[in-house]
């Protein structure tokens, strides 16, 4: 289960970006610590209700386990969406699927494995652009949450190159030593783009051709 959570559903630095670690630790605490402690508290040899008490504790543990797994699965990042000038991390429970039938087939169903990189399509006319703006301002819904607006990431490479930021800027928002240490691992990285997440914003390193190199645990802004 640990491998599924930290290497498949939440790879790279996405455990920090989404803030799932505390939920997972709480889940482990309930199953590994609280359950056995409750068992010891109710255990009394010869007690008539002992079997019932232990059954209730086991059922509570299983309920907490399944609910925790469900919450982690629903909150996992499924799309890393390039939108205008940044990436946006979209979790499974944040997808707006009311027009999912209008999405391209490859974007109608989120992967059960690692999150996928995609980009958003520009508004086709002024009315659609206004609708997008009002939906985000008034409803808090970004077009990054709408799969019907997704296109392959390579279609946004020209825009990514126009919006890319110099690596030197990262030293304004992070410890200089940390930046140098991380960048030394990825010499092919020539620029970066911000990634907005619900817990901690991250940095996406890209190369000269706007290929994604790595998501790293550096702040892309103040």
Where does each model-flagged region fall?
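Internal/C-terminal transmembrane anchor helices
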Residues: 52-73
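Short extracytoplasmic
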Residues: 32-37, 88-112
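Membrane-embedded alpha-helical segments of integral membrane proteins
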Residues: 1-42
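Extracytosolic and intramembrane catalytic regions of membrane-associated proteins
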Residues: 98-222
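Membrane-interface helix-boundary motifs at transmembrane edges
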Residues: 44-52
């Amino acid at each position: 289960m640990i491998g599924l959570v930290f290497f498949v559903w939440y790879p790279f630095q996405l455990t920090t970006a989404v803030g799932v670690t505390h939920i997972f630790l709480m889940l482990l605490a309930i199953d590994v610590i609280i359950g056995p402690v409750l068992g010891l508290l109710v255990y009394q040899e010869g007690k008539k209700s002992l079997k019932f008490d232990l059954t209730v504790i086991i059922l509570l543990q299983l309920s907490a386990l399944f609910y925790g797994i469900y919450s982690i699965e629903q909150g996992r990042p499924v799309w890393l969406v390039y939108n205008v000038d940044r990436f946006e991390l979209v979790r499974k429970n944040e997808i707006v699927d009311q027009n999912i039938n209008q999405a391209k087939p490859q974007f109608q169903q989120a992967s059960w494995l690692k999150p996928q990189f995609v980009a958003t399509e520009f508004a086709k006319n002024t009315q659609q652009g206004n609708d997008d703006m009002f939906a985000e301002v008034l409803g808090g819904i970004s077009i990054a949450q709408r799969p019907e607006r997704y296109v392959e990431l390579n279609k946004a490479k020209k825009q990514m190159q126009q919006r890319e930021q110099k690596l030197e800027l990262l030293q304004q928002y992070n410890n200089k030593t940390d930046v140098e240490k991380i960048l030394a691992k990825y010499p092919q990285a020539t620029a970066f783009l911000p990634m907005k997440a619900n817990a901690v914003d991250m940095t996406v390193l890209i190369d000269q051709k706007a290929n994604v190199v790595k998501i790293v645990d550096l702040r892309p802004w103040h």
